[in-house]
Every structure is written in structure tokens, then in C-alpha cells.
Amino acid sequence: MDFALFSSISIFEINHKDPPIRRFIKTQNRILSTRKQQGTFPKMKAELNLPAGFRFHPTDEELVKFYLCRRCASEPINVPVIAEIDLYKFNPWELPEMALYGEKEWYFFSHRDRKYPNGSRPNRAAGTGYWKATGADKPIGKPKTLGIKKALVFYAGKAPKGIKTNWIMHEYRLANVDRSASTNKKNNLRLDDWVLCRIYNKKGTMEKYLPAAAEKPTEKMSTSDSRCSSHVISPDVTCSDNWEVESEPKWINLEDALEAFNDDTSMFSSIGLLQNDAFVPQFQYQSSDFVDSFQDPFEQKPFLNWNFAPQG
């Protein structure tokens, strides 16, 4: 048997005429009314003691009219099924344990803070990620608009490169409320007194996104192991005893190489090797090709002037 549980004039309203159910409702009304007068509302799920078959499944208009409007007006809410938390301090998969009621969707009252002290945009950072709005805002209430419904998706990681998750939030706020910076007193970051949030996972799972999995590797990872290169492109590449990472090739300075080459030719000349008629023409031909590669294309002058053959 499916029942609907929501707050209106009485605490419970169900579409059923069974006298035992009616008596149960009256009993619960008396208990909760007494607790309301004593200020001892239940704080945990188990204290609700709802019978099997009851479901908290209010419409958008019921959420705004019977819950959000009353909370913002500091009026009592007879059925304590919506917890009051700072929702933006937590990841969405942490919220179900903080809810007072719910199996596949959970409801919360929360404040919103400004993103900037002098602005009216809300700060959407939450836990290890952030909430991102999707779609258009939906007005709630007819003929007069009472509230605004906004849909948001949770992204794990840092904006704007977070990983999209399956966690969804429907945020309900009151309409026609001045949230401009001109009403901001004493540089207060508080944007709203209260908003009402419905949280659920569209796949019906309790999937979690850890920070390590949310951040994509974008920087080179350095290692101090002498067997590895000083720059390893992929973080998946590690050092082991069975294989090594090839180090980067070392470039030889051209001036040092030429200086060493001149020293060698001077040594050859001193011992008479360059006086060999058979060696000199062949070496002049090879050196001529080598010098041509260093020609300046604009001045057509060689960068280097080598004369290996003896002057006659």
C-alpha cells in the first residue's frame, strides 16, 4: 500500500480511509505536537517511527509551500524529515548518512554563500569538487511564483576540469528575494537564509569519486632515482630492478667540438702527417664539404675558415 507523507494543515495527509491508519496518524500528531512544545524534535531517522508503506514524495510546489516557505519564515515544520546542514561542505555521497529520511533521494535545508563579497552569485564549491548548473530555472507555484527550481550536476575535482558524476541536486529557493550586494551587511558572505535541496544519484548507486581519481595528470613527474631520467612524461612509468628508463641524449657544444678538432689537426701538423701528398688532397676535399655546411645563406661567407693544406 503506497502512501504520501507531507506537511500541510495537519502533519500527515494520506489518501486512505482505513480507521486504524487514521488513529495512527492522530497518535503521531499528538506525539509530535508535544515534542514541538517541548522543543525535543527527533534528530535521527529511527526516531520517526514511520509505519511500512509511507513515502516522503512531495511535489515541487509542496516542497516550496509547506517546507521552504515555513523554514524561511521560522515557522515550525511538523514532520522533521529534512535535516539542516551546510551542504556545500560535503561531497554528495557523504550526504545520505546525514539525512533524516530517504532511501534513494535525500532532502536538506542549507545556506548559500556568495562567491564574491560584492556579488550575488552563489559559491558552488563543495567537498572535493563543485556543483554546476544545467538547464534553465523552473518557476514553482501558480498563479503566483513562490520559488525557483534549479538543477545542478556534481563534478569531482577542480574547476573547470572536473569529472562529471551521476550525482544530481534540485535546489529550491524563494522567488522575489533581493540578493544583491547592496543588501549585504558588514561584508557578509551569506547569500540566502535557506534553500531546500533534493539530492539523488541518477543511477541509483552510492558511487564515490576520490580526489586522486578526479585530477588528471598534466605535469611531468620528477624522480630522484639515479637509474631513471630526470623527466618522466607519464606518471605510470616507474623504476624497477628489471628495466630502466632511457635518459635524454646529451648535446655536445659545437664550439668545444671544433676547438678539440683544431687541437687534433695542430698535433697532426707538428708530426708531419699533413705533409703527406696522398693525404692532403683527400682531407682538403672532405673539409671543404664540411665547411660548406656552415655557409651563411645571406652573406655567402663561411662561419669557419680552416686551411689545413700548407701555404705555398
From Swiss-Prot:
Expressed in root cortex, root caps and sepals. Not detected in imbibed seeds. Disruption phenotype: No visible changes in phenotype. This is NAC domain-containing protein 102. It comes from Arabidopsis thaliana (Mouse-ear cress). Residues 50-202 form the NAC domain. May be involved in regulation of seed germination under flooding. GO terms for biological process: cellular response to hypoxia; glucosinolate metabolic process; response to hypoxia. The keyword Transcription applies. PANTHER family: NAC DOMAIN-CONTAINING PROTEIN 72-LIKE (PTHR31744:SF233), PROTEIN CUP-SHAPED COTYLEDON 2-RELATED (PTHR31744). Induction: By low-oxygen stress. It is found in: Nucleus.
